[in-house]
A protein has these predicted regions:
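Eukaryotic tandem repeat interaction scaffolds
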Residues: 199-202, 218-296
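N-terminal leader/linker segments that initiate helical-solenoid repeat arrays
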Residues: 16-48, 52, 56, 60-70
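Short coil/turn linkers that connect adjacent helices within long alpha-helical scaffolds
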Residues: 56-60, 97-101, 140-143, 181-185, ...
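TPR-repeat structural position
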Residues: 40, 81-82, 124, 165, ...
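Conserved alpha-helical positions within TPR/SEL1-like repeat arrays
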Residues: 25-36, 63-78, 88, 104-119, ...
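Bacterial Sec-dependent N-terminal signal peptides
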Residues: 1-23
């Protein structure tokens, strides 16, 4: 009877242990959803609760806890908070021990460590060293991981920050060539990457370089897409800032042609009517603007 009671108690303990671990996993899942909505404070709270449960259940050195710490560090980094480095490094060390150096999860944590020095600490030389190591490890993995583009471009970001534009340009052109070969020269995947690279240069103060990548992306996106309209606006504005009159005129004509085509489409939804009212107001046609506002 005593043996039976001890066995029952052991089973109950194991069940409670399992439930606690499962609760931690659920908290991490909830936190990821919150992170996707950019609700970082609530996500951080849930991740810290999950971390406490992992430690409580003996999962101090586990893949699950490493994932929790990785996401926790990322949430702090998205808020540009220094705590992000501590959690990211803990995740990286844990993943390196459990999974090995050439595991993509370890490399992702190493990448985030580099991002801390690049975007928060602004220690560009150190960021370049870490992102160089990230890329070196990533390049060993075959077949090429889907994260490879991002890891390599992050190294280019370091070179741009350091003013080493030739090195950055070499990486960018290499990645574009790879993407064109993988997805096709006129694929939307390539267009999105070109747009991303354009933003990278633009935000780094190199508008003259960024706009050339925006133009390449613009020439791929369909003219009825939101990206096309967005890039048309961005490119026009940049050439105005750069005082490049021939390009300003070129994109003004493209904008006029695009607007004319859009006006030929049916429009009876409030959002569409409001947008058209704003357009007519911008060109000084107040009668049509008023009519569309009233109809909306």
């Amino acid at each position: 009877m005593r043996q039976f009671i001890l066995s029952l108690l052991a089973c109950l303990c194991l069940t409670a242990y399992s439930q606690t671990a499962s609760q931690a996993d659920l908290l991490v899942e909830e936190a990821q959803k919150l992170e996707s909505k950019q609700d970082y404070p609530t996500a951080i709270t849930k991740l810290k609760q999950a971390d406490e449960l992992y430690v409580k259940t003996g999962k101090t050195q586990s893949a699950e806890r490493a994932t929790c710490l990785h996401i926790l560090g990322r949430c702090y980094l998205n808020r540009e908070r220094p705590e992000g480095l501590t959690y990211t490094q803990m995740a990286a060390n844990m993943r390196k021990t459990i999974l090995g150096e050439t595991n993509i999860k370890y490399i992702s944590s190493l990448n985030n460590t580099g991002l801390y020095y690049l975007t928060v600490a602004k220690d560009y030389p150190k960021a370049a060293v870490i992102h160089g190591k990230t890329w070196e490890l990533c390049s060993r993995i075959q077949p090429r991981p889907e994260q490879a583009f991002m890891f390599h471009i992050n190294l280019a970001r370091c070179y741009i920050a350091l003013g080493e534009m030739d090195k950055a340009s070499a990486i960018v052109e290499e990645e574009i060539a790879i993407s064109k070969k993988m997805y096709g020269e006129k694929s939307l995947s390539v267009a999105r990457q070109l747009q991303q690279i354009g933003s990278l240069y633009y935000l780094s103060g190199r508008k003259d370089v960024g706009v050339t990548y925006y133009e390449q992306a613009f020439n791929i996106f369909p003219d009825d897409s939101k990206e096309y309209e967005q890039l048309l606006d961005w490119i026009s504005s940049i050439y105005v800032e750069l005082n490049n009159q021939p390009k300003v005129l070129e994109y003004m004509k493209l904008a006029e042609a695009h607007n004319k085509k859009e006006l030929e489409k049916p429009c009876d939804e409030p959002v569409c009517l409001t947008e058209r009212a704003q357009y007519f107001a911008s060109i000084g046609d107040n009668d049509k603007a008023r009519a569309h506002f009233l109809e909306a």
